[in-house]
Amino acid sequence: MVRMNRSGVVLVGLALLAGCGAEERVEVTPDGVVGEGMAMETAEAVGGEYTAQAYCDDVTTWDANWASFETQVLNLVNQRRAAGATCGGVAKPAVPAVALDTRLRCAARKHSKDMAVNNFFSHTGTGNTAPWDRMKLAGYTYNAAAENIAANQATPEAVMTSWMNSTGHCNNIMNGTYKKLGVGYYYRASGATYKHYWTQDFGAP
């Protein structure tokens, strides 16, 4: 169940990498919604019945326009990192650029597709998978990792504005620990509440 609190923040009632009964916060923005920015500082092992290649098979061939959007988001992230930013009133210094990692892109694409096809919005995917599970299933081993999600924003510029205006997401984008990034964008014209679904998966090998 999704419910709106008095501050205008949507609260999704489910457990997310926390004790039972925790709530995942979803912020409403003028262009859409953004899920609570998540970060993991130590690697966790995960098992899986598929090889990384098989796991990524359905997102290897991608719509050219979607892939272009993903590249634009990566470029916008690096522009922000180069310029420095203010996240929740706290100044963040310029940090080095992140580079594309195709395994993280696989994990991000899988999650954006999952949210659109199954019409939900959460860091927890089908099969109760966490972001860290998807990264490991895609073959990526990390020492630190983070995920940002968003929905309904129709352009790379709009989704970046939403993320940068949200403290947790902005912190993930401006975190110099992360060296790699994968972006996933998926569009579903009908049958999905928000149509446009976005995921950023950050990693530090």
Regions found by a protein language model. Give the residues of each.
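A short alpha-helix/helix-coil micro-patch that ends at or immediately precedes a cysteine
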Residues: 51-117
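Bacterial N-terminal signal peptides that target proteins for export
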Residues: 1-10
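Disulfide-stabilized extracellular recognition modules
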Residues: 26-29, 34-39, 44-55, 142, ...
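Bacterial signal peptide processing site
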Residues: 21-24
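Short, surface-exposed glycine/acidic/tryptophan-bearing loops
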Residues: 101-154, 173-175
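Bacterial peptidoglycan biogenesis and beta-lactam-recognition machinery
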Residues: 87, 121, 169-171
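C-terminal motif of bacterial Sec signal peptides marking the signal peptidase cleavage site
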Residues: 16-19
